[in-house]
C-alpha cells in the first residue's frame, strides 16, 4: 500500500497538484517536497534532451549512409569499363588490375581490330595474363573482328578473373532518305555555284587562252614563212630527183633493148637482165636495212624531201626545234579552247549548242 501512495504523490508533484497532496497527507515534510521537486526537474530535463539526441544520432546515421552510398557508387564507376566518342574515335577506359588505376585507349574503328585492343591492354599492364572479349551470351569474339563491328553491340571484357559488362554507346547513322536528300542539296549547291561563277570563269579563261594563242602565232609567223620557202626548194629538188630516176630507168631500158636486138641475141642478154632485176631487189632490201622503212615510192619521196629540208635549214640558220615547240604549244592551246567551248561544258540548250558549233566551224574556215 505504501508504494502506490508514493507513486501517486510523485505524479501529483510533477503536475503541481500540491493541494491534493495535502489532502492525502496530513503531515507534509518540506524536505520530501524539495526532493520531489528536484526529481521533477531532472525528469523534465531528461524529457526535453532525449529527443534532440535521438534526432542527432538519426541524422548522423543518414549522413553516414548517404556518404557510404556515394562512395560505393563512385567505386562502382571506377571499376566499370566505359566507352566514349571523342572527335569521332572511340575511347575505352579500362581499370588495370596490377596498378589499380584506370587507363584510356583510343582506337580506330576500321583499321584497329579486337586483337590490337587486347595487345594494347597486355602491353600497358604486364600483370594481365588472360584477356578475352565475349558477347553477352558468352561467345568468344575473334581477334580479327574490327572495332567498328565490336562496338555495334554490348560485350563482355574478361581480364584475368574479372569480368566487365561493357555498354556500347549507340551511334546515330543516316538513313537512305537522309543521304539522298544530302546528295540532292549538294548537287543543287554545285549547280548554283556553277551558274553564278563558272560562266565568268570560262570567259576569263577563254580570253587568257586566246591571248596566249595570238602571241604564239605572231612568234610563229616569220618561222612559217621561212619554212614555206625551204619546203618549196626541197619539193623542187625531190621532183628533180624523181624525174632523174625516171630518166635513168629509160636509159637502162634503151641500153638493154639495143644489146638484145641489135648487138647481141636474147640468149646472151637473158642472164644479164636477170642479174639486173636481182640487183634492183638487193638495192630495195639495202634501203630497208639502212632506213628501217619499206621501199615505197611515196615514203621515199617524203623522206628525201625531209632530208633536203633539214639540210637547207642548217645552211640558212632556220631553228627547227623552236618551230616544233611553238607548233606544239599552239596545238595544246587550240585543244584547250575546243574543250572550253564544248557545248556540254557550257550547259547550253540544243539550239544554242548548234549555234556555238556553227560559230566554231566558221572560225576554223576563216583560219
UniProtKB/Swiss-Prot annotation:
Record motif Selectivity filter, residues: 266-276
Stretches assigned to coiled coil: 199-233
Disulfide bond annotation, renumbered to this chain: none
Binding site for Ca(2+): 270
Subcellular location per the Swiss-Prot or TrEMBL entry: Mitochondrion inner membrane
Activity: how regulated: MCU channel activity is regulated by the heterodimer composed of MICU1 and MICU2, which act as calcium-sensors. At low calcium levels, MICU1 occludes the pore of the MCU channel, preventing mitochondrial calcium uptake. At higher calcium levels, calcium-binding to MICU1 and MICU2 induces a conformational change that weakens MCU-MICU1 interactions and moves the MICU1-MICU2 heterodimer away from the pore, allowing calcium permeation through the channel.
Membrane-protein topology: Multi-pass membrane protein
One GO CC term, this protein: uniplex complex
Main location, first listed in the record: mitochondrion
Keyword entries, A-Z: Calcium, Calcium channel, Calcium transport, Coiled coil, Ion channel, Ion transport, Membrane, Metal-binding, Mitochondrion, Mitochondrion inner membrane, Transit peptide, Transmembrane, Transmembrane helix, Transport
TM stretches of this protein: 233-253, 263-284
Similarity comment: Belongs to the MCU (TC 1.A.77) family.
Protein name: Calcium uniporter protein, mitochondrial
Gene name of the record: MCU
Amino acid at each position: 500500500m505504501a508504494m502506490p501512495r508514493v507513486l501517486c504523490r510523485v505524479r501529483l508533484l510533477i503536475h503541481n497538484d500540491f493541494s491534493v497532496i495535502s489532502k492525502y497527507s496530513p503531515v507534509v515534510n518540506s524536505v520530501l517536497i524539495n526532493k520531489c521537486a528536484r526529481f521533477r526537474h531532472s525528469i523534465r530535463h531528461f524529457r526535453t534532451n532525449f529527443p534532440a539526441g535521438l534526432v542527432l544520432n538519426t541524422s548522423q546515421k543518414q549522413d553516414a549512409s548517404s556518404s557510404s552510398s556515394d562512395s560505393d557508387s563512385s567505386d562502382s564507376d571506377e571499376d566499370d569499363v566505359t566507352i566514349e566518342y571523342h572527335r569521332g574515335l572511340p575511347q575505352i577506359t579500362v581499370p588495370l588490375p596490377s596498378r589499380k588505376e584506370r587507363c584510356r585507349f583510343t582506337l580506330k574503328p576500321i583499321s584497329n581490330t579486337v586483337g590490337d585492343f587486347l595487345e594494347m591492354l597486355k602491353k600497358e599492364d604486364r600483370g594481365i595474363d588472360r584477356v578475352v572479349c565475349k558477347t553477352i551470351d558468352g561467345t568468344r569474339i575473334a581477334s580479327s573482328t574490327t572495332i567498328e563491328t565490336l562496338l555495334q553491340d554490348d560485350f563482355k571484357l574478361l581480364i584475368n578473373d574479372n569480368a566487365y559488362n561493357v555498354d556500347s554507346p549507340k551511334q546515330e547513322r543516316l538513313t537512305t532518305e537522309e543521304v539522298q536528300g544530302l546528295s540532292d542539296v549538294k548537287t543543287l549547291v554545285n549547280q548554283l555555284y556553277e551558274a553564278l561563277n563558272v560562266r565568268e570563269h570560262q570567259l576569263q579563261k577563254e580570253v587568257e587562252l586566246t591571248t596566249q594563242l595570238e602571241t604564239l602565232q605572231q612568234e610563229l609567223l616569220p618561222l612559217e614563212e621561212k619554212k614555206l620557202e625551204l619546203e618549196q626548194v626541197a619539193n623542187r629538188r625531190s621532183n628533180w630527183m624523181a624525174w632523174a630516176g625516171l630518166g635513168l630507168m629509160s636509159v637502162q631500158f634503151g641500153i638493154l633493148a639495143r644489146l638484145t636486138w641489135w648487138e647481141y641475141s636474147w640468149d646472151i642478154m637473158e642472164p644479164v637482165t636477170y642479174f639486173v632485176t636481182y640487183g634492183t631487189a638487193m638495192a630495195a632490201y639495202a634501203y630497208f636495212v639502212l632506213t628501217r622503212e619499206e621501199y615505197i615510192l611515196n615514203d621515199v619521196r617524203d623522206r628525201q624531201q625531209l632530208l633536203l629540208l633539214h639540210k637547207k635549214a642548217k645552211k640558212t640558220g632556220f631553228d627547227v626545234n623552236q618551230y616544233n615547240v611553238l607548233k606544239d604549244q599552239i596545238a595544246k592551246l587550240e585543244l584547250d579552247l575546243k574543250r572550253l567551248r564544248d557545248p556540254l561544258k557550257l550547259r547550253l540548250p540544243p539550239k544554242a549548242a548548234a549555234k556555238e558549233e556553227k560559230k566554231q566551224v566558221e572560225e576554223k574556215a576563216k583560219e
